[in-house]
Amino acid sequence: MQLKIIDQSGCLYLKVQAERIDAAAAIQFKDLMRRALTPSLQQKIIDLEQINFIDSTGLGALISLQKAQQNAAKLTTCSLHPQVAKVFKLTRMDEVFDIYATAEAALKAASAAPAFKADED
């Protein structure tokens, strides 16, 4: 499993280069993502185009990554394979993450979104 990382116009775009996120790959996936995703106000897009299978451990890894962001910007996903999109819908993960059909749509939405501001104490 590899992760292609591009910092584009203040948005962190991460393309997962693997076919599966299952029990065998979830730990590696989470480790790669945690190194790339530092809690920041930067918009983050996770491109899952090459993933054609995800199980509960993969979903758990995504939730864990979202929670690790704390007050930072919400994670966005894009380019879901139809089988992966079905799993997201059945598990209601489509209500947890913003999902876009393409990377271009996700990047356009991220660039149009107002800057995220953390609550000041």
PLM regions with names:
Residues A101-D121:
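A charged, well-structured terminal subsegment
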Residues M1-L14:
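Short beta-strand/loop segment at the start of cytosolic alpha/beta domains
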Residues Q8-S9, E49, E104:
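Conserved catalytic submotifs in the C-terminal HATPase_c
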Residues L14-K15, D47:
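Short beta-strands and strand-loop turn motifs
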Residues G10-C11, E19, T102:
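Beta-strand-connecting loop/turn residues
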Residues K4-I6, C78, Y100:
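General small-molecule cofactor/ligand-binding pocket signal
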Residues R20-F97:
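Amphipathic alpha-helical interaction surfaces in cytosolic regulatory modules
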